[in-house]
Amino acid sequence: STLSSSSAASDVYKRQNLDSDDFSDLARLTRNTTLLHREWFTANERRTKLRWEWHEFFKEYDVVLAPVASVCAFPHDQNPKISERLLKVNGEKRPYNDLFFWAGLSCVSYLPSTVLPTGLGNDGLPIGIQVIGAEMQDLKTIRFEQLIDEQLNVFVPPEKYAV
C-alpha cells in the first residue's frame, strides 16, 4: 500500500463516519475529495450544462467584467488551520473560503480569466477586476485587459515588489 492509497482509504473511512448534519469546512472537503463516481458524474453533468449556458452567453457578449474577490487585497491570515481563518467583508467577519467564489465563477466552467490591477486602495494594496472570456478565448481576455490598461495606466507595483 502506498501513502496515497492509505490516505485515500483513511479519507473514505472519515467520510463514512461523518454526521449527516456536519457542514464544517473539513467535512465538506472530506466529502468532496471522496466522491463516488456517480456523485462526480452528477456534478460534472451540472458543470456541462453550465458550460453550455456560458457558450450561449458569449454568442452575444465578448467578455464579463467581475470582481477578483469579495474584498480588496489584504494582509493574509497565516493561521495553519484554514477553516479558522477569517476576513472582513464590509466590516463583517466572513469565512476565508468565501474568497474563492469569484475565482470559481470562471474556473468551474473552464473559462479563461485575466486579472487586471485597476489601482491601489486606501491601504496601498492593489485593487483589480477579472476579465472572463469564452472557453478557449484566452487571447481575447488578455487583449481586452491590455486595452483597458492602456486607458487606465494606473498599475504601480507595491514598493516591496517593484523591480
Which ranges hold each PLM region?
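A conditional alpha-helix N-cap/helix-loop micro-motif detector
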Residues: 2, 44-47, 95
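Short helix-loop capping/hinge segments that flank enzyme active sites or metal/cofactor-binding pockets
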Residues: 10-55, 71-72, 76-79, 112, ...
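Structural helix-boundary/capping segments
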Residues: 41, 52, 95-97, 102, ...
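Short, high-confidence coil segments that cap the C-terminus of an alpha-helix
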Residues: 61-62
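Short, surface-exposed loop/helix-turn segments at secondary-structure junctions
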Residues: 74-99
